[in-house]
Amino acid sequence: VGSEMCIRDSLIPWERTFSKQTIYEAAASQNTTVFKGSTMKQEAFDDGYVPFYGSSELSRFDPLHPSVIAEKYHRNYRPFLLGGPGSQSLAQFLGMQGTAKQLKNKKAVVIISPQWFTKKGQDPNAFALYYSPLQACNFLLSAKNNKTDRYAAKRLLEMPDVKGEIKNSLQQIVEGKKLTTFQKFYLNNRRRMLSNEDNFFSAFQLRDRVNKIQKKAKVLPSAYSVKALNKVAAEQAAM
């Protein structure tokens, strides 16, 4: 009876909202739990944050980092950093799935690293760090029978961490077939459970980089000037 109650409770949608301070800290944390989730990103994008998709370069917090620039010059947006070492285009594609509504007709920044372009493509070990079954469910439940979604499903099938009914459902998309009634039922219930976990765990273990951002901002000139910023960049490069 106890296990049945736990399963039933996990399927009940659990709503929560995050404080502005928590979202502010999450935006610069590059936390993989936030990357793989949906709710924190949805609230942030609804509140004017702009997603910055990238990889390891986002981790270098120098005075010219986009989060530092936005802080110093009081931009009307805040960068929301998504990605870290190893988060290549396939992981980023999957990570975007839960925020399509929030990003419609809005701006985003994509930083493309030359190291992404290899003959072997996405490193499976790196992909495993960012793989989100929640976002896989989101993708599958909205996938269309078009070239883009079939190709994405094919690439996801090549990743060892993709297993079980998610893997079977991806094969349906690759073959241009509709999901079965059971697959839709399974994916909807799995998504509901994973969404509840996302709502609960997203605010845990955030890297607090607020002090670091504010410290780096002090190096910048008080008035925004491309010439002055170039000087700061040259000084930083010489250090």
Go through each PLM region and give its residues:
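Membrane-embedded segments
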Residues: 58-148
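A broadly tuned preference for mixed-charge, low-complexity surface segments
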Residues: 27-31, 98-114, 157-177
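Membrane/wall-proximal cationic-aromatic binding patches
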Residues: 15-77, 95-96
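Short, small-residue-biased leader/transition segments that mark boundaries at the very start
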Residues: 1-6
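Residue-identity detector for glutamine
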Residues: 21, 30, 42, 88, ...
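Phenylalanine-focused residue identity feature
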Residues: 18, 35, 45, 49-52, ...
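N-terminal membrane-targeting segments
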Residues: 8-15
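Secreted/periplasmic serine-hydrolase-like ester/acetyl group-modifying domain
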Residues: 137-239
